[in-house]
């Protein structure tokens, strides 16, 4: 199911952990509405400005999946209001460009979000996602 020009519901609910553990990671109607807002108002504008594919490493998480991956009990992922993303190359340099694009869009008022976190945003150190 397409939620925006470049993003699908399947991308936002996909989880290797859920598959391995037999967890059904399906949003309810309110969570689906939130995911649609997330894609149309935040992710798609980022993708359009960045001009290259963006990979969603974690989107919606049901309660059971969130517990399994050690997510915070009040995580926005539980409500369909958060996504961890990175570039297709997942290099420091490309992720830095993506991060800078996001900050620019936020500063211009094009996107509105509560948090922007660059996890392990140091060259050659640990996982990289925004």
Q: Predicted regions span which residues?
A:
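Active-site microenvironments of hydrolase-like enzyme catalytic domains
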Residues: 69-84
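Extended, low-complexity, intrinsically disordered C-terminal regulatory tails
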Residues: 41-70
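A broad, low-specificity signal marking well-ordered, structured residues that form hydrophobic/aromatic
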Residues: 54, 83, 129-130
């Amino acid at each position: 199911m397409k939620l925006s020009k470049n993003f699908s519901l399947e991308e936002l609910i996909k989880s290797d952990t859920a598959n391995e553990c037999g967890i059904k990671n399906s949003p309810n109607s309110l969570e689906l509405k939130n995911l649609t807002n997330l894609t149309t108002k935040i992710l798609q504008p980022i993708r359009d400005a960045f001009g290259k594919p963006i990979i969603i490493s974690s989107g919606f998480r049901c309660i059971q999946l969130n517990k399994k991956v050690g997510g915070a009990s009040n995580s926005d992922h539980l409500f369909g209001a958060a996504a961890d993303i990175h570039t297709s190359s997942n290099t420091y340099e490309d992720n830095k460009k993506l991060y800078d694009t996001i900050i620019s869009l936020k500063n211009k008022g094009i996107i509105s979000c509560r948090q922007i976190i660059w996890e392990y945003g140091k060259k050659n150190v640990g996982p990289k996602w925004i």
